């Protein structure tokens, strides 16, 4: 390679990388997002999940935790499985180099890096796929793919971007396999995709099968077609098996703990209309990434024109055009037919961010645009004109029926028509030889990049308007104070304990602030333990996507080892004492918190839970303590509000016609002596569905309550002596409120104290290290260790170095039966299936190498 050619190639690849990066930098800067800026890129799930899980990984890489298991989420969680869904990127280790306070900037840098790598891999692959296409057009295709609306509209889910880095390489590898019998790139890139993101790997596998069937049309002879398809199948299967080191443990975790398949509720998907394909191929169009969205498929008007031209060009084999047309039709049918839509997504209905496979249609659009450009000199001007007229007509029909597309802004229509006209003029001038090829390529490139930049600007702006890009101050709020308090608790304790925050910012605060906790918001979760916790007052309903600590009792606190509470308000919970404070954040210690492993009096037998939370807590506490006490009783109460109406077991109040800003309802309650008081307010109906604020004033002291994803069960404080308590329920922002008659409950703290003393006096001490749990116990009788750890087949146990069986306890937890006397129990977590998966990966890789060598050897012999 000459110096000039080398430098030209280098500049080409630098441009491929930096074009999407610079556009994204400019677009994000327009949203006031840049390194160190007040606003951050952490919108929607980026704030609540992805950056927090990245922080968890960062802490583990710094030696604080295990890549296999973490106790900082949902009582305990298979972190290896979590990694496969949320952190499956070869770039994730880069988070190691940032501090916890720099994670917002780390997320920004790595997201930009991924956009650049998409452009780079696209340029590398498309240049080899479409050898007759000029580099300027290759850059148009690679930049269009990098900045497709699917990626930019969901940029906060930056783990998905890794799939787009690998996709062009996989397609290039497939072409090398089918055309030149070269299998290495296809095998390696597909294996990497399965390892990094099994979810998108599944979608890609479907696409590759369909795409290969169409590609076989170009291969002559049925025997050759069959042999090539078998070859494709063998290499694809070996790639899947080679990724078993990640796939098998993840699959086993999902089948054991994941949610069930989603059945189709109707034939058609929601919010669809006839011209969705063209409506979503306008410049800068964004409807929503919440429910009711239609697919994000924009990759640029230029690729779309060339994509349409592909199907009307006689220069391309009719059977090939029909094959691709059927593939496109299958995609479009999937957007409309719910069963097909679910099939692409593994028979699981997504929680927002719908049609997650639609990026594959964007990829196909770019590939067919490249095929068209590869033959552009052979096309007739009339066919080209027909492509422009067809797209113009489609846009016109979409505009006529724009009542179905209220999300399309006038600027999108104007820009789309303007760029369509610009491309039409350029192509017409070139085909009529009115401008030289260099001018045509230069101006087409400039218009294309400018169009993509504008579209990205409007899409990201709309994303920010819908979800809001949060401030850095908001993300780091209380970070310093909580970090210091958590550090103090770690210094003060040698045995295992849990901490929870009363005024949560996210469902994953425990992982964000690096303390062992209960709350969780994750697609990777233990549904069995979450369902059991739901029965015990930690709300986790439906598919168990959410699990929340807040709004439960001190019984639940103590049984699940909650030794510390973090709170901005003075805490009035029996057994909790103030330890210290940092700024406005207080640290409170629970003197009754149990160990991670509760030693029972005799062998533990499962009990039946009902739908009544307090009954379940009573039964569990009595079973673990060996007592038969009563803990909860109703506290007498009276509605003390003349403007509130009580009718048919419902309480209602409306202040719309008064000068009051919101509803307040007052009760008087008699709190028994030695009682922790609670109130249950079922089935609240809010006049403002966007404002579910509730504050409760107890004897003049007001506290804001948590109502998001929690039970409507609120703590009213501890009362040492019998008291007449005035309770005022306030609903800010709501001028009309109704709810079922509230129930006030008093927890007998004397009986509770006896039960917890009975449990905690037993000799059981628990420590943890990485993926191991160590229990030193002493028991006078044969007993059980009841572990408040989610049941998982990845756990193994030994007693005094002898392997023993771990049993399910209450469906979601674990127990180990232990003999009398002193002993040491060690639990070790290795993701279930990891050892087998590692062996399968090794064998599959060896088999692939042997297979590739054998085929190559056979081919050489046949040629000779």
Task: Give the role of each language-model region.
Residues 200, 326, 348, 354-478, ...:
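Contiguous transmembrane helix-bundle modules in multi-pass membrane proteins
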